């Protein structure tokens, strides 16, 4: 669902790490074919890849359910910014988070977190604002 949304919003690409096979029929169905239209790369070492992007001038954020992280609505994003969305079970690893500026989606209700697809959608929308 994140890939489907990314492609629909015109996101430039995706860097995937520890994901299912993108050509798995269920994944292709969930993306509504977006995986065939969205440029992507597989990362073997996400923390190292993030370091490379940062050395090339990219700003890299990580979405975390942490009130001390920067409120996503207060960030002025640029077209070359990157945001890491962790998986629903473990979130963003400490090694990866150490390379990123943490951001959060402030929630008014009692939910502790959002699922990855919903969080990813909100993050992408805010980054394009």
Language-model regions, residue ranges each:
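Short flexible/disordered coil segments
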Residues: 57, 77-85, 122-129
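Structured adenosyl-cofactor binding patch, chiefly the S-adenosyl-L-methionine
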Residues: 8-9, 19-22, 27-35, 94-129
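RNA substrate-binding interface of SAM-dependent RNA methyltransferases
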Residues: 1-68
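Active-site/ligand-binding-proximal alpha/beta "capping" segment
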Residues: 61-112
């Amino acid at each position: 669902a994140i890939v489907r949304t990314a492609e629909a919003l015109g996101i430039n690409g995706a860097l995937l790490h520890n994901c299912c096979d993108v050509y798995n029929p269920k994944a292709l169905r969930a993306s509504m074919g977006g995986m065939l239209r969205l440029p992507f790369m597989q990362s073997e070492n996400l923390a190292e890849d993030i370091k490379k992007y940062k050395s090339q001038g990219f700003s890299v954020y990580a979405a975390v359910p942490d009130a001390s992280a920067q409120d996503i609505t207060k960030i002025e994003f640029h077209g070359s910014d990157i945001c890491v969305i962790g998986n629903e079970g473990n979130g963003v690893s400490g090694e990866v988070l150490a390379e990123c500026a943490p951001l959060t989606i402030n929630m008014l209700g009692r939910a502790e977190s959002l699922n990855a697809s919903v969080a990813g959608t909100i993050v992408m929308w805010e980054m394009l604002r």
